[in-house]
Amino acid sequence: MISPNHLILLFCVNCAFLVASDATPKRSPLGTMRFGKRAIADEMTFEEDGYYPSNVMWKRSTVDSSEPVIRDQRTPLGTMRFGKRSAEPFGTMRFGKRNPENDTPFGTMRFGKRASEDALFGTMRFGKREDGNAPFGTMKFGKREAEEPLGTMRFGKRSADDSAPFGTMRFGKRNPLGTMRFGK
């Protein structure tokens, strides 16, 4: 049986351990990554005890400049802030150009050139496009005749009187189109 002195000693050691663990800063387990900037002297999580800590920032939102937005300077480990943001949560990315009066969400991308204003973000125009009614994302690569549809490729050499369709390849020395001769 355990003596009362041992129980009291065990209780005191347990209390000392609990007090010491509350006094030390909390560390994240091994393998967790911290990226982005964070205040060094901050050990308290945001709204952990039901009140706002003293190190919150008041920053005006770009959407509505009349009401301020409360943000925590210390974000939890692993949260990334990249790009510009207003009231969106951390980790939302804004890339490309965005019309400020348009109500498109963050993360919509505009790349390439866009002609019409009603085309959606994220539609890509690559290569040259001749007629205006061809949809975005159609690619023209290689040389083509005017009656050939977009996206047809001509590679290799083809004579003007050759009846082979586009996309047939001539490589090496040949008798018929597409047959290959290796070596000497």
Swiss-Prot record:
Its main location: secreted. It comes from the Eukaryota. It is found in: Secreted. Residues 24-25, 39-73, 130-142 form a propeptide. Residues 1-23 form the signal peptide. Residues 90-110, 150-184 are annotated as: Disordered. One of its GO terms (biological process) is neuropeptide signaling pathway. GO terms for cellular component: extracellular region. Keywords: Amidation, Cleavage on pair of basic residues, Neuropeptide, Secreted, Signal. The modification Phenylalanine amide is found at F35, F82, F95, F111, F126, F155, F171, F182. Each flp gene is expressed in a distinct set of neurons. Flp-3 is expressed in the IL1 and PQR neurons. Pfam families: FARP (PF01581). FMRFamides and FMRFamide-like peptides are neuropeptides. SAEPFGTMRF-amide inhibits the activity of dissected pharyngeal myogenic muscle system. Belongs to the FARP (FMRFamide related peptide) family. This is FMRFamide-like neuropeptides 3. It comes from Caenorhabditis elegans. The lineage of its organism: Eukaryota, Metazoa, Ecdysozoa, Nematoda, Chromadorea.
